[in-house]
């Protein structure tokens, strides 16, 4: 009976550890996805603002 308790405890412990690793990897993937979305948004803003910046810098160079 004692062996069954220990083995059950070991199985549950290993299951929890593997779940925590999976959650950690999922969080990293989500963070990477969020970073790539932020980079896309920044790139879109730069695209919109680039013509205005170029016009201002050309005007100051005259």
Curated annotation (Swiss-Prot):
Major localization listed first in the record, in broad terms: secreted
UniProt modified residues of type Lysine amide: 58
Propeptide segments, given as residue ranges: 25-46
Biological process annotations from GO: defense response
Functional summary from the UniProt entry: Induces contraction of smooth muscle in isolated rat urinary bladder with an EC(50) value of 2.2nM.
Family as reported in the entry's similarity comment: Belongs to the frog skin active peptide (FSAP) family.
Record-given protein name: Sauvatide
